[in-house]
Amino acid sequence: MAEAGMRKILIIGIGSGNPEHMTVQAINALNCADVLFIPTKGAKKTELAEVRRDICARYVTRKDSRTVEFAVPVRRTEGVSYDGSVDDWHAQIAGIYEALLSKELGEEGTGAFLVWGDPMLYDSTIRIVERVKARGEVAFAYDVIPGITSLQALCASHRIPLNLVGKPVEITTGRRLHESFPEKSQTSVVMLDGEQAFQRVEDPEAEIYWGAYLGTRDEIVISGRVAEVKDRILETRAAARAKMGWIMDIYLLRKGADFDE
């Protein structure tokens, strides 16, 4: 809870691209905000901002709130380690957040950041807000509102359970997939994979459930044995990226039956 005379921030999970993913709690939170902050990521990713605008147009009923758009800097990848690159990027964004809060939000105002999916899963908004808070230049309290993740949307579109009965689930990146699947994990969800690491899975029984642009009108899903569908996924992914200018995908790898025989 925010103290009297203190700014308040709402970090709102908005789902994975379908405005109907918005929960009642998220809609109510939108309508508590005086200022709605919408990130933009360049001409190639205008749809990400457009979904947020659509959500505000659909669900914000108060007349006195306003939207403020801000550009998200591109993460530098050359000449720096991955961890260093991410840290520098987060520092840049923290500076932007700090400026937004001090310039756009009154001392007792409430601002909302609309976060793709759920803020707890492979998103850095909470970390960045904590960084701003630690700097101490702007005093505020914040709450987090959960949302539907791309992982939930993936399982729903493929009509599969996330886990095998009584078995654990691993959530990892493409860079680290080789460390676990299929030897140590029967179910691995890959959230970030610029290398399409699934094509290096050699187990003939491994299944893949892949999805891109989940929840949006451009959603694509493919499933099957990795050996049988990997080339189709690679081709489909490349074509979609060329058409859209960006790609946002996720997949689940499985070793074992989804349903009992």
UniProtKB/Swiss-Prot annotation:
GO terms for molecular function: precorrin-6A synthase (deacetylating) activity. One of its GO terms (biological process) is cobalamin biosynthetic process. Gene3D superfamilies: Cobalt-precorrin-4 Transmethylase, Domain 1, Methyltransferase, Cobalt-precorrin-4 Transmethylase, Domain 2. It catalyses: precorrin-5 + S-adenosyl-L-methionine + H2O = precorrin-6A + acetate + S-adenosyl-L-homocysteine + 2 H(+). It comes from the Bacteria. It is an enzyme of class 2 (transferase). Its EC number is 2.1.1.152. Pathway: Cofactor biosynthesis; adenosylcobalamin biosynthesis; cob(II)yrinate a,c-diamide from precorrin-2 (aerobic route): step 5/10. InterPro entries: 4pyrrol_Mease, 4pyrrol_Methylase_sf, 4pyrrole_Mease_sub1, 4pyrrole_Mease_sub2, CobF. CDD domains: Precorrin-6A-synthase (cd11643). Keywords: Cobalamin biosynthesis, Methyltransferase, S-adenosyl-L-methionine, Transferase. PANTHER family: COBALT-PRECORRIN-2 C(20)-METHYLTRANSFERASE (PTHR43467), PRECORRIN-6A SYNTHASE [DEACETYLATING] (PTHR43467:SF1). This is Precorrin-6A synthase [deacetylating]. It comes from Sinorhizobium sp.
